[in-house]
Amino acid sequence: MSIELDLQIACENEKDLPSEKDFMSWLNAVLPQFQPQAELTIRIVDEKESHELNHQYRGMDKPTNVLSFPFEAPPEVEIDLLGDLIICRQVVEKEAVEQNKPLLAHWAHMVVHGSLHLLGYDHIEDEEAEEMESLETELMQEMGFEDPYLAEK
């Protein structure tokens, strides 16, 4: 079991960001259950970059909490590269306050949520959303965090 993380800090204010150890801990709680070897990039960005990427790839004219870009290798190529997660620092901080969640718990949730997207999970259809949210809740609770959707229930 091996996870390789390329952590890129591309935001102006690095104060109070989770550590690389935090990110690795969250990834190790999720990925090995689905894929024993994995390589991925987590890029922490400001609202401007998140907004640009969200607009370019999703047609949404605003920044978002996490964007997932799965790597799709040709069928004949075996590679452990999962893809990239782009997480917007300001959106995560804002949402944690709005949802009355500890900031570290919300960071962990964004890593879990984005990782599941890289693994092929989605939440477009109601049934898929229920499955994904249930899995997120289970994984978060295994790490000692509360149900991330508690406020919505």
Curated annotation (Swiss-Prot):
Organism name: Aliivibrio salmonicida (strain LFI1238)
General function of this protein: Single strand-specific metallo-endoribonuclease involved in late-stage 70S ribosome quality control and in maturation of the 3' terminus of the 16S rRNA.
Alphabetical list of Gene3D superfamilies matching this protein: Metalloproteases ('zincins'), catalytic domain
Origin organism lineage: Bacteria, Pseudomonadati, Pseudomonadota, Gammaproteobacteria, Vibrionales
GO CC annotation terms, alphabetical: cytoplasm
Taxonomy, superkingdom: Bacteria
Listed name of the protein: Endoribonuclease YbeY
Predominant cellular place of this UniProt entry's protein: cytoplasm
Keywords associated with the record: Cytoplasm, Endonuclease, Hydrolase, Metal-binding, Nuclease, Ribosome biogenesis, rRNA processing, Zinc
The keyword Ubl conjugation is annotated on this UniProt entry: no
